[in-house]
Amino acid sequence: MSLFSAVEMAPRDPILGLNEAFNADTRPGKINLGVGVYYNEEGRLPLLRAVQAAEKARIEAHAPRGYLPIEGIAAYDQGVQKLLFGADSELLAEGRVVTTQAVGGTGALKTGADFLKRLLPNATVAISDPSWENHRALFEAAGFPVQNYRYYDAATHGVNRAGLLEDLNALPSQSIVVLHACCHNPTGVDLSMDDWRQVLDVLKAKGHVPFLDIAYQGFGDGIDEDAAAVRLFAKSGLNFFVSSSFSKSFSLYGERVGALSVVTNSREESGRVLSQVKRVIRTNYSNPPTHGASVVASVLNSPELRAMWEDELGEMRGRIRTMREAMVAQLAAQGAKRDFGFVAQQRGMFSYSGLTAEQVERLKDEFGIYAVGTGRICVAALNNGNLDTVTRAITQVL
């Protein structure tokens, strides 16, 4: 008998599996609104000018490709800290933030989860309902029980504030609470600053450990604006975790450029925490890759390239906002049987469209338009060339 005779076929990843189905579809004119990737107006992945300039300089320097330190490139880690906490952050001045380069946002989450399992082995993890599909899998793989807290209100297309606060308060003390710092995935519905303050009050009262996930900084309202929750928590006195990613904001998806940041109580404590996080990394992938983080570090630490990148990020953010507004206008003009005005109020790359699983299936079968079964669509995949096709198809399946 084979060692693998009892191995069962794993279910397809709901997002990446959708991409596989899309690639296998031979119909011309098919449209993929499922994958979480920013496409430009021409329907292509952009190669940012700031990234091209940084890569050109790196190639011309003929830099050696030795092993990086376990925690990654120092200039990269410092650039991440300033982007998240602000260049004038007291926490940074006091040495109270530990940042390590990670293999994408996913690697940052898993490293943080593995470290937390050593600190709080009996803790419960809570994620929003709904949340990014991999949040549950990552924390369950680290050995934690995972449950949901209420977040999205389908009736209002907004936040279920009362349910959110009630569920956070009902969690066992010292639970680990995963929060989307901005551009909530999959709903596009974010907390207001007043909401954040109320959430913070509950977390402090219950002794919960916040784990902020920020994969879309700059895609909501701006780089500093989208870091507002992180900076609010930085003033709270709490210890907390932040996972961050540059896949979207630098269009470096395949380079897996992320970071884990941990807020401590002192410089001395930071040293001990860093030593333990490095042990986790060493037993997972030893040390991170060089190229993507080198590019990001060069851009963040060069005033000229930083300004160029911020302009390009602003263009991407503006195009998504334009597509949201155009989608709402097109659906209304085509006589859609419901009001989609809420789509224009959402933030980031995604929209919780309100489409049912059956309607999403019809979009795929009848029109070759792929979306996630929950009704999540990637607004960043829309453009002036496919918007009319998409909105007409949505109108027909309602």
Which residues does each predicted region cover?
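N-terminal "arm"/small-domain region of PLP-dependent enzymes with the aminotransferase-like
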Residues: 2-72, 79-82, 283, 289, ...
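Conserved core of the PLP fold type I
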Residues: 52, 57, 62-204, 218-219, ...
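Short beta-strands and strand-loop turn motifs
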Residues: 32-35, 148-150, 177-182, 211-214, ...
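Active-site PLP attachment segment
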Residues: 229-272, 276
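Structural signature of PLP-dependent enzymes
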Residues: 274-292, 299-328
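Hydrophobic "anchor" residues on beta-strands that sit immediately upstream
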Residues: 176, 209, 241
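Conserved PLP-binding catalytic core of the aspartate aminotransferase-like
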Residues: 310-366
